Amino acid sequence: MICSLASNLKDLTQFPKAEIEALWCPWRVEYFEQETPNPDFLSEAARSSDDAAHLVVTRRKNAFLMMNRYPYSVGHLMAVPYRKTGDASSLGENEVLELWNLAVHGQRLLRETMKAQGFNVGLNLGQCAGAGVPDHLHLHIVPRWNGDTNFMPVLAGTRMLSEGLRGLYDKLIATQERIEKNNAP
């Protein structure tokens, strides 16, 4: 079908283009209004003691779990090593283990808080692979739901975010406190 459609076109500029409509995402306006985006926000979050300001959900010895401040999918978390590196092979065994344990913990938080039914978990290593912060790797934990690719993104090219960052942050912290209380000796 595409081959026959393309053969009927005089040039590729006539090929139909998919357009994506924008929905207002108030938390993203900060990102676009920055004179220069802060490329070191992960290191700042690692050093800071103000977890709420940096949306840090939990801290461990070698890594921490934080919300993505500019998500396109509600609930998007990131497991981040304290040590700044863009090379996964330079991570120590304890760092790798802790990153993975934080990814598992993040999945539990999202399952219990948002009723997530599945997850995309992964790394973008290097700028050409889509890393927004290529020199400080981070493991993405993106919640998914059956039917989350509904008519809006398919037909209208639009994604909807159902909850603001601060409200979700508070819910994740409450869920984490409940989990810790239930697991206390």
Language-model segments: which ranges?
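Short connector loops/turns at beta-strand edges and beta->alpha or beta->beta junctions
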Residues: 70-74, 82-85, 144-148
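Histidine-centered divalent-metal-coordination microenvironment in nucleic-acid enzymes
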Residues: 76, 130-150
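Active-site microenvironments that recognize anionic phosphate/pyrophosphate groups
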Residues: 1-74, 79-80
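A short glycine-rich, hydrophobically flanked beta-strand micro-motif that places a catalytic Asp/Glu
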Residues: 114-127
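Short histidine-centered catalytic/ligand-binding loop motif
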Residues: 78-100, 156-161
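Long, well-ordered alpha-helical scaffolding segments within enzyme catalytic domains
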Residues: 92-116, 166, 171-173
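C-terminal helix-cap and adjacent tail motif
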Residues: 8-35, 144-185
